[in-house]
From Swiss-Prot:
Gene Ontology MF terms: ATP binding; ATP hydrolysis activity; ATP-dependent DNA damage sensor activity; mismatched DNA binding
Pfam family, one: HATPase_c_3
Protein name as annotated: DNA mismatch repair protein MutL
GO annotation (BP), single: mismatch repair
Entry similarity comment: Belongs to the DNA mismatch repair MutL/HexB family.
Source organism of the structure: Xylella fastidiosa (strain Temecula1 / ATCC 700964)
Annotated gene: mutL
GO cellular component, one term: mismatch repair complex
Length: 619
């Protein structure tokens, strides 16, 4: 077959195969265009889950009549004009591919009007064939109608799923968008019935977070707001005991754009590593903000993925921020919850939707949840921007100020004797009153009853003390009497050669002895009884994939957790009131004491009002 130039309609239909996967893809592209046009309200009307009709109506800036034919041409856009614009793009869309791709596989109508125009205009396209632009009555803003999606591409249409499934994809995308843009009013109707309405608000008013993710999520949320090295991470993560069976409540936004990023997800999972029950997943809504020039958003047809210029710095920043947030939690301390309505006053209000910007453009989500540690100074101070060449300096800024050690500021209560104090001075976990079946400690607190699993609690206390002790002496190495030869892939050998200093800091002395072989001369002393060969392979795999590894630290922590478990007080051991109170005070002063080393909860609170309801008091 000879080489030939494809017709424009076929080119657009091929492009539609990348951009328009299903009705949810159409809704995504059109609503993002509305947001880029400054809309504060978007109405989405669907019939047959978008297969029969998708109508998107917004109150944005609108377009002039003469711009309508341009809007449906490939690579025609108002958002970029040069390579510099592309490298610093802050809008959700920028390629100019969505409208022509959608119009080529549907019966397409575009209506728009600017506020300064006397009337609007309408343009109809069927199967890629443009009609005439004619005057049309229309409110300021834009309306796009997409009818009979894939009517001229039967092979694509037969791959669509059931109506309920396709509608579910649209609703899930709408939830993700509503989280990123709390000041946007979003209405979703299906077959003439209003199914979702997200009212405009902000994160402090908690309405949207509860509406989308539920009260349990909102009341277990820990606020995150951390800046440094030209980066900012804010949003919320939930306490470990709210973990999920599936990773279905994990939302990440980069400069307001919803994305999936394996490196960031890996960093969050590592931060939860020793407080999460096996097989469970954390839940979070996180917003990462950085200079648009430091992230490439033009790497995926649907813009679901991005590429960071310094992925290792991002990974470390996210890990330390989330890990630091979790480390601030103490047994008895209520979460810094989103949704309890405890933030008032003008100074507590988040900035407006146009506040976050690195290049003069609007930067998507810009709300603030406040610092994860209201009582301590920020861990890091931000700097304006960092180039790849300045990465070492960025790392120095990132690690310049270690997290505040609250342990040093809280006195250890060893006597366990109740203090002569008023109700306002009752400790968070109260005072012990009894032991239940030799397993649980019962304590009276200011507003009810505390129940503590004494083995789980003592296990966490011992574990954290062991970690601090080993952190203080550093990681010691043990030379091997006979060097160990390790056969690896050439790529892994390259990583070992380039990361020799990193491996040395982890306790491994490794030299390359051939294209695919390594000589291991020393290993971490604490892990000498483990399987150093398998551990080193895992370390090389992490360094290759993420540029960062915590395998040695995790292996060390696993060993220390086992030691702490064996050294913890056993069930059915009788404790005196003083011993129980000492354990409660240690819990209040120990990081992550809300969970044992295996991720199980260590305590529970029953309020007096809850207990009253058990006995129908006050009715």
């Amino acid at each position: 077959m000879p080489i030939r130039q494809l017709p424009e309609i076929l080119i657009n239909q091929i492009a539609a195969g990348e951009v328009v996967e299903r009705p949810a893809s159409v809704v995504k592209e059109l609503v993002e265009n509305a947001i880029d046009a400054g809309a504060t309200r978007v109405d989405i009307e669907l019939e047959a889950a978008g297969v029969r009709l998708i109508r998107i109506r917004d109150n944005g800036h609108g377009m002039a009549a003469q711009e309508l034919p341009l809007a449906v041409l490939r690579h025609a856009t108002s958002k970029i004009a040069s390579l510099d614009d592309l490298e610093a793009v802050a809008t959700l869309g920028f390629r100019g591919e969505a409208l022509p791709s959608i119009a080529s596989v549907s019966r397409f109508t575009l209506m728009s009007r600017r506020a300064t125009d006397e009337h609007g205009a309408v343009l109809q396209i069927e199967g890629g064939t443009l009609g005439e632009v004619i005057p049309h009555a229309h409110a300021p803003g834009t309306t796009v109608e997409v009818r009979e999606l894939f009517y001229n591409v039967p092979a694509r249409r037969k791959f669509l799923r059931a109506e309920r499934t396709e509608l579910g994809h649209i609703e899930e995308w709408a939830r993700s968008l509503a989280l990123a843009h709390p000041d946007l009013e979003l209405r979703l109707s299906h077959n003439g019935k209003l199914s979702r309405r997200y009212k405009p608000g902000d994160w402090y008013s908690d309405v949207r977070l509860i509406e989308i993710l539920g009260e349990d999520f909102a009341h277990q949320a820990l606020r995150v707001d951390h800046s440094g090295a030209g980066l900012r991470l804010h949003g919320c993560i939930v306490q470990p005991h709210y973990s999920r069976l599936n990773a279905d409540q994990q939302y990440l936004y980069v400069n307001g754009r919803p994305v999936r990023d394996r490196s960031v997800a890996h960093a969050v999972k590592q931060a939860y590593s020793d407080v999460l029950y096996q097989g469970r997943h954390p839940a979070y809504v996180l917003f990462l903000e950085l200079d648009p020039a430091r992230v490439d958003v033009n790497v995926h047809p649907a813009k679901h993925e991005v590429r960071f210029r310094d992925a290792r710095l991002i990974h470390d920043f996210v890990y330390r921020t989330v890990q630091g947030t979790l480390a601030q939690t103490r047994a008895g301390t209520p979460p810094l919850a989103v949704g309890v309505g405890d933030v008032e006053g003008e100074g507590a209000r988040p900035p407006g939707r146009h506040a976050v910007s690195f290049s003069g453009r609007r930067g998507g989500a810009s709300h603030v949840l406040g610092s994860y540690s209201a009582s301590t100074a920020p861990l890091m101070q931000g700097v304006p921007s960092v180039s790849v060449a300045d990465a070492p300096a960025a790392y120095a800024a990132l690690y310049a100020a270690p997290p505040t050690q609250v342990m040093d500021a809280v006195p250890q209560m060893q006597t366990g004797l109740p203090l002569a104090a008023g109700a306002g001075d009752v400790p968070l976990l109260g005072y012990a009153i009894a032991q239940l079946h030799g397993i649980y400690i019962l304590a009276e607190c200011a507003d009810g009853l505390i129940v503590v699993d004494m083995h789980a609690a003592h296990e966490r206390i011992g574990y954290e003390r062991l970690k601090r002790a080993h952190d203080g002496i550093g990681l010691r190495t043990q030379p091997l009497l006979v060097p160990m030869t390790l056969m690896v892939a050439e790529r892994e050998a390259d990583v070992a050669e380039c990361e020799a200093e990193t491996l040395a800091n982890l306790g491994f002395e490794v030299t390359r002895s051939g294209p695919g072989s390594l000589q291991v001369r020393s290993i971490p002393a604490l892990l000498s009884q483990a399987e150093p060969e398998m551990l080193l392979r895992d370390v090389l795999s992490d360094l290759s994939e993420h540029g960062h590894t915590r395998r040695v630290a995790e292996a060390r922590d696993t060993l220390l957790a086992t030691m702490a478990c064996h050294g913890a007080v056993r069930a059915h051991r009788r404790l005196s009131i003083s011993e129980m109170n000492a354990l409660l005070r240690d819990m209040e002063a120990t990081e992550r004491s809300g969970q044992c080393n295996h991720g199980r909860p260590t305590w529970a609170r029953f309020s007096l009002a809850e207990i009253d309801r058990w006995f129908l008091r006050g009715r």
